[in-house]
């Protein structure tokens, strides 16, 4: 294997980090809430946190971006860094044909081409805001080990190579300028090489990069070993945590989200991270959110995320789902197609009716531009949300989410899929916090005339107060209605109904 040479950089020693207030850092939200009481790194202490702050339950929508050196290939998926080393895969053959043999042209060689020359941070932040998101940010580090911030801990970072920009810091500042909050997602738990000693499992799933002595993925030299994970576990686990601490200190993210395989990190380090993050926030009067998948963290500490899916019923706990705009990869690939905006909006409504929050994913190109097809979906969603904002933001799920005829398939990662084909006969509900307003969503254009709302019948979950009026939201058109021991219906007009999703407001005394 040839020696790895990275002529663009001089790498310093990996010793600590600078703890400073950055341009992307957030001001204290509630100075009066600052306290000296500290969380300790054990679940009994950490479970005292309010894992679902009011602002998060109110927000309903966040947006993040899968973007990194893997988008240079624009082939396969964001798992290209792994699959290009899996013999027999289409990515393996594509890489050899397009870039060269893996022994001569490794994943690290793609990084200089990740230049982000069209990355406009203000355009990104504005797009997220226009889509209706209340928080946004980057995939700070995917499974590939490349940090999308200016790091003193990780030598493979966007500040020193590739874009040579502090992507996370710039986004944090641009979002907060718009009164939006920041998410940083981390997928690096599987970056450690755990299979080097087991030839039969060099392609094992517990490590991202397949091990092979002829490839850079086996390098134990600096700095390559930190990218490919060839570091003793006793060094790597602190490295995993130190990167999180650095991001917390520099950017003060409001949400830190973890992908699966977090369970492979020893409990001690997960607890130490949680304690550090929660104490850091508490000292600044902030309420933050930790999100996880499967059973990787206790529900009393962290919000559960269901990938590309949703709940089948109302959840007592606030939950999260991460959903792609694309029909293929999370990252940009050539030939990518996208979901219909109506599909995205209707599935979003289903999520919030069941006490959930949606994290939408966008897939920028390697140059930093967001394809117009993705922008179209986001802007259509934003226009719909702007029209019906009061039925969405700050509302809560009812005891019964709704009813309808749409058939939901089981999701790959639990619950149901995020691509259910709803229609105007499918109904969902939200309500105001004071329970003085119920919002009725028809997931498509409903038929005009009498619409029975069986979920609001006297024997189910009727309105809690006398009804004052019923209106077609967005048109302020009063509707005929009846809610009593015998009837529970509204009368929909022939005009003013929304093709995407029609919303009716039931106001109470």
Residue ranges and their predicted role:
Residues 24-509:
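Mature catalytic domains of secreted/periplasmic carbohydrate-active enzymes
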């Amino acid at each position: 294997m040839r020696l790895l040479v990275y002529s663009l950089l001089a790498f310093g020693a990996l010793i600590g980090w600078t703890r400073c207030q950055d341009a992307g850092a957030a001001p204290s939200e509630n100075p009066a809430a600052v306290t000296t009481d500290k969380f300790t790194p054990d679940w009994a202490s950490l479970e005292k946190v309010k894992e679902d702050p009011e602002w998060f339950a109110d927000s309903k929508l966040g947006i993040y971006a899968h973007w990194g050196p893997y988008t240079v290939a624009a082939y396969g998926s964001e798992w290209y860094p792994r699959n290009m080393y899996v013999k027999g895969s289409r990515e393996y053959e594509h890489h050899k044909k397009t870039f060269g043999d893996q022994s001569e042209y490794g994943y690290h060689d793609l990084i200089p081409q990740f230049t982000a020359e069209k990355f406009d941070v203000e355009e990104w932040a504005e797009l997220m805001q226009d889509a209706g998101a209340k928080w946004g940010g980057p995939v700070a580090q995917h499974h590939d080990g490349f940090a999308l911030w200016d790091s003193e801990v990780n030598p493979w970072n966007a500040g020193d190579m590739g874009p040579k920009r502090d992507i996370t810091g710039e986004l944090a500042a641009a979002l907060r300028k718009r009164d939006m909050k920041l998410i940083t997602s981390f997928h690096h738990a599987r970056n450690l090489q755990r299979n080097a000693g087991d030839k039969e499992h060099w392609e094992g799933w517990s490590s991202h990069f397949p091990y092979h002595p002829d490839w850079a993925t086996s390098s134990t030299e600096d700095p390559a070993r930190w990218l490919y994970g060839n570091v003793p576990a006793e060094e790597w686990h602190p490295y995993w945590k130190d990167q999180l601490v650095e991001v917390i200190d520099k950017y003060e993210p409001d949400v830190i989200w973890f992908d699966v395989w977090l369970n492979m990190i020893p409990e001690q380090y997960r607890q130490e991270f949680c304690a550090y993050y929660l104490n850091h926030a508490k000292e600044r009067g902030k309420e933050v959110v930790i999100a996880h998948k499967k059973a990787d963290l206790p529900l009393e500490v962290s919000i559960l995320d269901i990938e590309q899916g949703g709940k089948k019923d109302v959840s007592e706990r606030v939950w999260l789902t991460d959903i792609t705009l694309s029909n293929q990869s999370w990252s940009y690939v050539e030939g990518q197609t996208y979901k219909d905006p109506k599909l995205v909006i209707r599935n979003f409504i289903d999520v919030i009716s069941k006490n959930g929050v949606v994290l939408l994913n966008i897939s920028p190109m390697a140059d930093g531009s967001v394809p117009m097809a993705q922008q179209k979906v986001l802007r259509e969603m934003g226009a719909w949300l702007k029209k019906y904002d009061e039925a969405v933001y700050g509302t809560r799920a009812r005891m019964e989410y709704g009813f309808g005829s749409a058939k939901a398939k089981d999701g790959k990662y639990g619950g149901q899929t995020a691509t259910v084909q709803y229609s105007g006969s499918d109904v969902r509900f939200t309500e105001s916090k004071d329970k003085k307003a119920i919002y009725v969503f028809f997931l498509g254009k409903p038929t005009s005339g009498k619409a029975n709302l069986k979920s609001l019948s006297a024997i189910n979950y009727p309105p809690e107060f006398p009804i004052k009026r019923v209106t077609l939201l967005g048109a302020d058109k009063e509707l005929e209605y009846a809610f009593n021991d015998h009837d529970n219906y509204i009368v929909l007009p022939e005009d003013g109904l929304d093709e995407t999703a029609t919303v009716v407001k039931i106001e109470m005394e």
